[in-house]
A protein has these predicted regions:
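Histidine/lysine/aspartate-rich catalytic loop segments that bind and position anionic ligands
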Residues: 115-150
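Glycine-rich phosphate-binding active-site loops on the catalytic face of alpha/beta enzymes
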Residues: 13-25, 90-94, 99, 144-150, ...
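Active-site/ligand-binding-proximal alpha/beta "capping" segment
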Residues: 142-144, 149-195
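Active-site beta->alpha loop and helix N-cap motifs at the rims of alpha/beta catalytic domains
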Residues: 4, 9, 14-16, 20-22, ...
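Catalytic cores of alpha/beta
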Residues: 1-8, 124-134, 176, 180-196
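Active-site-adjacent beta->alpha loops and helix N-cap segments on the catalytic face
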Residues: 23-32, 41-54, 74-80, 95-112, ...
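Short beta-strand/loop segments at the ligand-binding rim of alpha/beta enzyme cores
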Residues: 59-69, 110-120, 167-177
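Conserved, mostly hydrophobic/aromatic
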Residues: 19, 85, 132, 189, ...
Length: 228
């Protein structure tokens, strides 16, 4: 994993999202669910992911965020988890199973340790988009389409109007994720927003190439970045 991250960084990734595996990742499609199962079977723990970040931070300077589930944070101990994030150099936390209404469970700790709690914005009402955007920190994760993560052949949501409402309410950058896999899609999303988030497409490369995958992930990241 460290090699893959370093290749992604060397080829122009602007931010790295690392998943801490959970047995029931409700926001994820089959590709990332499969990766969660494999990681847990291989003995990946929260502490091992923390150690990975400590190693990466020897030379990786771009922002890094964790994506995981509330249960993972609770079972580790929320304060211990979030304070460790700060110490090892994690900039933000993405918890897809915590809706806006429940973020107070984690927000005070995130603010205490200066770790951004990343807000999700899905296709929803203008009022709700504005409400979430006004309180967002770090960056806003715009969900391209309702459903789970995974690659999609086309994205039909009117994302431009969602981003317009976000921009009217905050200067926090927003990036679009869920279903982005091709350079063409990435360009389209980056034209609308501040960036594109890619997960499943990279996991597929890792599944296909195994030990040889860092090189291929690097090439893929470069192709995506060049398209922007």
């Amino acid at each position: 994993t460290a090699k893959i991250v370093r290749e992604a960084v060397a080829n122009g990734a602007d931010l790295i999202e690392l998943g801490i595996p959970f047995s029931d990742p409700t926001a994820e499609g089959p590709v990332i669910q499969g990766a969660n199962i494999k990681a847990l079977a291989a003995g990946v723990t929260t502490d091992k992911v923390f150690d990975l970040v400590r190693d990466l931070r020897k030379d990786v300077t771009i922002p890094m965020v964790f994506m995981t589930y509330a249960n993972v944070v609770y079972s580790y101990g929320a304060e211990k988890f979030i304070s460790t994030c700060k110490v090892i150099g994690i900039d933000g936390l993405i918890l897809p199973d915590i809706p806006y209404e429940e973020k107070e469970e984690f927000l005070p700790l995130c603010e205490k340790y200066d770790v951004d709690l990343i807000s999700f914005i899905a296709p929803t009402s203008k009022d709700r988009i504005a409400m979430i955007a006004k309180e967002a920190t770090g960056f806003i994760y715009v969900i391209s389409s309702l459903g789970v993560t995974g690659t999609r052949s086309e994205i039909k949501t009117d994302l431009a109007s969602i981003v317009k409402v976000i921009r009217e309410n905050t200067d926090v950058p927003c990036a679009i994720g869920f279903g982005i896999s091709t350079p063409k899609q990435a360009k389209k999303m980056a034209d609308i927003s501040d960036g594109a988030i890619v997960g499943s497409a990279i996991i597929k490369i890792i599944d296909e190439y195994g030990e040889a995958s860092p090189k291929y992930v690097g090439e893929y990241v470069k192709a995506m970045k060049d398209a922007l």
